[in-house]
Amino acid sequence: MFQRLNKMFVGEVTTSSSQEPEFSEKEDDEWILVDFIDTCPGFSAEEEEEDEDIGEESSAEHTSVFSCLPASLECLTDTSDSCFLQFESCPMEESWFITPPPCFTAGGLTTIKVETSPMENLLIEHPSMSVYAVHNSCPGLSEASCGNDEYNSSGPRMEAQSEMGKHIHCCVAALAAQATFLEQPKSFRPSQWIKGHSERQSLNRNGLRRQNLTRDCHTRQMKHSGWVVHQPCPRQYNY
């Protein structure tokens, strides 16, 4: 690299009189720089011949590959819309030929039908399985309802009579409920309420304790009735 810089500053020019392809090698610190100058016409002619040979071999390989293609792709190659079927003239690697599926390269053909497996639509809800769909499961009921509509339209008087009968029935039921509600206070008597309340209170634990205390106080007062000063008995429980 330093030699190259020195040559640029000093102005040394290397000229070669031979017509062979020129190679300029520069060694510096174990680095080799090779500059290939493609100015030889003989070498370019040789390259063109090699390219032609490679093109013939690749065309032969392509014909063999196209002969192995399925019938669907062969019919596609015959179509006028060849925008999707222009393959580059490159050698095949390991006899693999990668093409898009037929549905993308059909080019408007209607003869090719893309087959779909029934397992593809398992996650798609079928209209018969829809929750929001309204199914007519009873055609007999619908026919009967249509017949009833025709009959009702022919007889409006029957509708009016049926409505009046329903209204009267509702009024009678409401009056019967009101009568039973009014009869309940008459059957309820205060003596029965007092008796039941006293029984419930007497069976209570606190009520029994109060009765015992009142009895004890009354007996003590009877014992000390001869004294002049009457003092109240001490309260055992703070109620």
Swiss-Prot record:
Q: Short name of one Pfam family for this protein?
A: DOR
Task: State any GO BP term from the record.
Answer: negative regulation of cell migration
In which residues does the motif LIR occur?
25-37
What Gene Ontology molecular-function terms does this entry list? antioxidant activity
Q: Where in the cell is it found?
A: Cytoplasm, Cytosol; Nucleus; Nucleus, PML body; Cytoplasmic vesicle, Autophagosome
Q: What induces it?
A: By adriamycin, methymethane sulfonate, ethanol, H(2)O(2), ultraviolet irradiation and heat shock. Rapidly induced in acinar cells of the pancreas with acute pancreatitis upon caerulein treatment.
Query: Where's it mainly located?
Result: cytoplasm
- Keyword terms: Activator, Antioxidant, Apoptosis, Autophagy, Cytoplasm, Cytoplasmic vesicle, Nucleus, Transcription, Transcription regulation, Tumor suppressor
**GO CC terms for this protein?**
autophagosome; cytoplasmic vesicle; cytosol; nucleus; PML body
Give disulfide pairs as residue numbers: none
Cite the record's tissue specificity text: Ubiquitously expressed with highest levels in the thymus.
> Subunit composition?
Interacts with p53/TP53 and HIPK2. Interacts with PRKCG, GABARAP, GABARAPL1, GABARAPL2, MAP1LC3A, MAP1LC3B and MAP1LC3C.
Q: What job does this protein perform? A: Antiproliferative and proapoptotic protein involved in cell stress response which acts as a dual regulator of transcription and autophagy. Acts as a positive regulator of autophagy. In response to cellular stress or activation of autophagy, relocates to autophagosomes where it interacts with autophagosome-associated proteins GABARAP, GABARAPL1/L2, MAP1LC3A/B/C and regulates autophagy. Acts as an antioxidant and plays a major role in p53/TP53-driven oxidative stress response.
Q: Any domain commentary? A: The LC3 interacting region (LIR) motif mediates interaction with GABARAP, GABARAPL1, GABARAPL2, MAP1LC3A, MAP1LC3B and MAP1LC3C.
- Can you name this protein? Tumor protein p53-inducible nuclear protein 1
What is the originating organism of this protein? Mus musculus
Q: The organism's lineage?
A: Eukaryota, Metazoa, Chordata, Craniata, Vertebrata
Gene of origin?
Trp53inp1
